[in-house]
């Protein structure tokens, strides 16, 4: 996969950088694995906005992704690498030996024709899924389970990878993409390799309209609002925010303010927080 730059024929092309989609091998998705996807526009069941700056965008169909990888010891052939509008990673269509078809998150380097498997003692090979207890230290992994059997919940975004640092007792030490070092049950499963579309972080949309196509509405600064609408609003000209620290629209501290609950039960699994030099 690479990136595509454009000649500045129009203002919208001047800063546009897009993926070249060279890894995509099939344009039409597998019909049996599609489901309707209703847009919420950032509203909840009462119709109240719960997520600002969302709405519109191109209509999408949801692709059912196999995050559990629970079809053990049955080889699957990679039939295609496809685009998924609902995530940043590419997805791979697997044809299992028994005839079943499933989508998985495509790891970097997976190609059409490759054979992948999941199970307790499968080979350490890109795309294979197995428990942490059977994966060597130092291996890059993705689609990582938080709890055994629940399915992969972590490390699913484009270009991300976690790394197994070591094992002790019934726990594995894993460094997550954020830098956090955390304990995981050795029976938690993960997929070998790094998530595909590693150049996603270098994409530049080039114009506001392209954000609208993705369902993102303009993100208005608080300082550009009236005082009635935001704590940062009001004042003459470009006024300072007028508070000791930045605040959310609802008056809560933000930008660096710690929001994690004190004495959260899962604290005992976190060995080192992201960007924290000292170990607990």
Swiss-Prot record:
The keyword Zinc does not apply. Pfam families: Ribosomal_L2, Ribosomal_L2_C. SUPFAM superfamilies: Nucleic acid-binding proteins, Translation proteins SH3-like domain. The keyword Lipoprotein does not apply. GO terms for biological process: cytoplasmic translation. GO terms for molecular function: RNA binding; rRNA binding; structural constituent of ribosome; transferase activity. Belongs to the universal ribosomal protein uL2 family. One of the primary rRNA binding proteins. Required for association of the 30S and 50S subunits to form the 70S ribosome, for tRNA binding and peptide bond formation. It has been suggested to have peptidyltransferase activity; this is somewhat controversial. Makes several contacts with the 16S rRNA in the 70S ribosome. HAMAP family: Ribosomal_uL2_B. This is Large ribosomal subunit protein uL2.
